[in-house]
């Protein structure tokens, strides 16, 4: 804690009252799991993009990505963190549902709840929920010192139209480079997967350019898909057993797919614009 009082005279005896304020913010998570036929099993709860540095007085400078770290907590339903301030900034958002990756500042602090969701009479799917911190305003993403943030989160489904919901195991989670080809195991309990689909070619954000046509694709050449679809797949049993049962596009920039019942196979999926043109 810290404080100050400028009303001080060094030539006389002084009795000073100094108001102290906390140098950190308190973040509390209260997690409620489904209480019906659906089942959600938590695998990890993380606090992402936490500032590493703590200053005696309030900082006005934005935090850089190099000054951030991540916290991993236990999987209990009630967790409290004490963290330094993070001036991630504000946006023009007006709807709480739009607070997700791509709309939020890259350095904004958020809670990531990971686990396996099994809907009633459905198959298990890996899923993560991202909840960004900020003031009582959809546009604000700042974490301010001497402030308490209470997040009451209730898990209620895996809606692909909600950008805060990340359905499927993330195949592009290793770093900024994604691939144009992925291999997954059909024997895993999880049948749902996702990968980033906002950059052409192999998705590299670096100077490496790869194009299946042989033409040059500028590094980081971004696209803005509206939907995704199946282009081609192998099928078993005279075409009745599919490699993929579902292909879709989520609002947060991922193509999401669900494995079919085929024990092995190949498939091609594509990101598309609003006119169904392949991007």
Residue ranges: model-predicted function:
Residues 132-176:
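Low-complexity, acidic Ser/Thr/Pro-rich "mucin-like" tracts of secreted and single-pass surface proteins
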Residues 168-243:
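Solvent-exposed, low-complexity, repeat-rich "mucin-like" stalks and linkers
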Residues 102-106, 260-265:
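Surface-exposed, short loops/turns at beta-strand junctions within beta-sandwich domains
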Residues 277-278:
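Hydrophobic or amphipathic alpha-helical targeting/insertion segments
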Residues 1-10, 14-19, 26-145:
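Tryptophan-paired
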Residues 14-16, 149, 253-255:
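Short strand-edge motifs at loop-to-beta-strand transitions and within beta-strands
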Residues 263-274:
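A short beta-strand micro-motif common to beta-rich folds, especially ectodomain repeats
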Residues 62-86, 215-252:
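Low-complexity "stalk/linker" and mucin-like segments enriched in Ser/Thr/Pro/Ala/Gly
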């Amino acid at each position: 804690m810290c404080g100050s009082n400028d009303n001080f005279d060094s030539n006389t005896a002084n009795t000073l009252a100094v108001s102290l304020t906390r140098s950190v913010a308190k973040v509390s998570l209260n997690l409620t799991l489904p209480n019906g036929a659906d089942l959600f099993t938590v695998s990890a709860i993380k606090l992402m993009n936490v500032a590493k540095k703590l200053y005696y007085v309030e900082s006005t400078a934005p935090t850089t990505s190099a000054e951030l770290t991540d916290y991993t907590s236990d999987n209990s339903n009630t967790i409290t963190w004490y963290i330094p301030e993070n001036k991630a900034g504000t946006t023009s958002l007006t709807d709480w549902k739009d607070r997700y990756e791509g709309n939020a500042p890259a350095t904004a602090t958020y809670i990531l709840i990971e686990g396996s969701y099994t809907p009633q009479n459905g198959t298990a799917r890996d899923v993560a929920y991202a909840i960004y911190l900020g003031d009582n305003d959809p546009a604000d993403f700042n974490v301010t010192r001497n402030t308490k943030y209470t997040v009451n989160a209730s898990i209620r489904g895996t809606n692909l139209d909600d950008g805060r919901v990340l359905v499927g195991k993330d195949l592009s989670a290793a770093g900024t480079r994604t691939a144009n080809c992925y291999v997954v195991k059909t024997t895993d309990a999880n049948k749902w997967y996702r990968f980033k689909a906002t950059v052409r070619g192999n998705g590299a954000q670096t100077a490496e350019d790869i194009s299946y046509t042989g033409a040059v694709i500028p590094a980081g050449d971004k696209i803005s898909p509206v939907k995704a679809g199946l282009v081609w797949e192998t099928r078993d049993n005279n075409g009745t057993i599919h490699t993929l049962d579902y292909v879709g596009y989520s609002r947060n920039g991922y193509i999401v797919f669900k494995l079919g019942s085929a024990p092995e196979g190949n498939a091609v999926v594509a990101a598309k614009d609003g006119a169904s043109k392949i991007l």
